[in-house]
Structure formats: C-alpha cells, structure tokens
C-alpha cells in the first residue's frame, strides 16, 4: 500500500487503532478521525510518525454533523493528495430494550452506525472513483441475528449491511465496497450486560472457543484494502465461528 491514502473513522482506539497500525506498516498514509479520544489519537499519531515522518494526520469531528462530513474527505485530499480507502469504523453501542427506546437513542445509534457511513461514502465516492479505491464498513454479526435488548444498534448495523451492498452496485466498477462483521473481539466498556459470566457464555458458543483480538479485524481490513481486486458487495464474518452457532 505504499503511497495509498486511508481515511479511518474512529481510528484512535481498539479496532480502528489496530487497523491503522497494520495499514501503516504496509506503507499507507493515514488520516485518523476521532471525536473525543484526543489523547489516544495524538499518541497513535506520534507512534506512527516516529516510524515514518508525516505519514499520519488527525482530524477531529462529530460524525452526527452531516454537513461537516465532506470536510473529512477534503482535508484528507489536501493533506495527502488523494484518497484510496475509506474505513467506516466509528460506532456507538449500548442497549435499547423495547419500552426504553427514545428518539435520542435512535438518532445517536442510527447516526453513527448508518447515517455517517452513508454520507461520508457519498462524499468520498468521486475521489475513490478516480483512484479505483474501496470502502470498508465495519458491520456486526448481529446485523443478521439481532442481539436481545440492542434493538436500535442491531437495526442500524442491518442497515449498514444493506448500504454496503447498495453502494457496491452504485459505485461499480470503479470502487469496491465490502463489510467486515466482527464477533466477540473486544468487550464493550462499562456495559453490565457483558459481565464475566456472560463473556464466558459467549466465548463457549464460538467454534474456536476463544475471544478474538482487534488484530483479527485489522487483518481482514488489510485483506479488503490490498488483496481483493475481484471482491465487492460482500460481508466477511470474523467471529471465531460464532455466527454459525447463533
């Protein structure tokens, strides 16, 4: 990926940071978006720029601001001269059981998981078409098999799967669009629904009998970014076999 340019949303931590490190090691230049994780974003930028100077830049933005999304693309192109890969990774995740769902929950979860990827992909499409690039969306295995009490999140990720396939048709043949559906990779922070007993139960239902790691998703990101010139409109489950047992 030497000379290629990647825009990663939610790139400061967890799966985003793991993907950033792997793509950077492959030679890519990175625009890393963050919303509130400034400390982590700057630390990652310093780490990677120490390896290859001026190869990583940061952009802070609230992805709920639809009108501001094109500026992420414009700033990436202004900084690095183009855009080859858009990784829609940023996501909100929390329970919304029926009876407790408010409009604010709907707007937040739909906004980060579906609306932002849609409008950011639309803004990036002209540049990606010029450079025959790709879009990679981080979906979820629960897009097809909804998780109890996570109604809005599951619906939003189902929409993102549909968006992935729709964009693959709309942007072909110049742009490839694929998705990655993680399983039990990193446990949500501060969510009591995922206590130790729940975690062990989930892991026991994976075929590989272990939780995954952000690097597992990063490897799939690199696969779609670098090695799949004849794959588009597909969703790859990286879940230790859990979705086959749900």
Predicted regions and their residues:
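Conserved glycine-rich cofactor-binding loop
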Residues: 12-14
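A glycine/serine/threonine-rich, flexible loop-to-helix segment
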Residues: 45-46, 179-206, 245
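Active-site helix of classical SDR
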Residues: 121, 156, 164
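Alpha-helical segment proximal to the catalytic Tyr-Lys
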Residues: 126, 168-173
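C-terminal substrate-recognition "lid" of short-chain dehydrogenase/reductases
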Residues: 127, 210-238, 243
């Amino acid at each position: 990926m030497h000379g290629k340019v990647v825009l990663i949303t939610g790139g400061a931590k967890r799966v985003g940071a793991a993907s950033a490190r792997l793509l950077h090691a492959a030679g890519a230049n990175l625009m890393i978006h963050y919303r509130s994780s400034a400390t982590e974003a700057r630390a990652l930028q310093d780490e990677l720029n120490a390896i290859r100077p001026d190869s990583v830049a940061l952009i802070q933005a609230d992805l709920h601001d639809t009108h501001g999304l094109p500026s992420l693309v414009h700033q990436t192109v202004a900084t690095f001269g183009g855009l080859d890969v858009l990784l829609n990774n940023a996501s909100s995740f929390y329970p919304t059981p029926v009876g407790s769902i408010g409009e604010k929950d709907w707007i937040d979860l739909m906004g980060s998981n579906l609306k932002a990827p849609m409008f950011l992909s639309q803004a990036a499409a002209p540049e990606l078409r010029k450079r025959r690039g790709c879009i990679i969306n981080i979906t979820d295995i629960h897009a097809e098999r909804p998780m109890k009490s996570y109604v809005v999140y599951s619906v939003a990720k189902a929409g993102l799967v549909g968006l992935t396939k729709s964009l693959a048709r709309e942007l072909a043949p110049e742009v490839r669009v694929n998705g990655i559906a993680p399983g039990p990779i990193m446990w949500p922070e501060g969510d009591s629904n995922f206590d130790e007993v729940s975690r062990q139960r989930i892991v026991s239902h994976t075929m590989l009998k272990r939780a995954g790691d952000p690097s597992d998703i990063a490897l799939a990101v690199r696969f779609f970014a670098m090695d799949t010139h004849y794959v588009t409109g597909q969703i790859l489950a990286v879940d230790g076999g859990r979705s086959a047992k749900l």
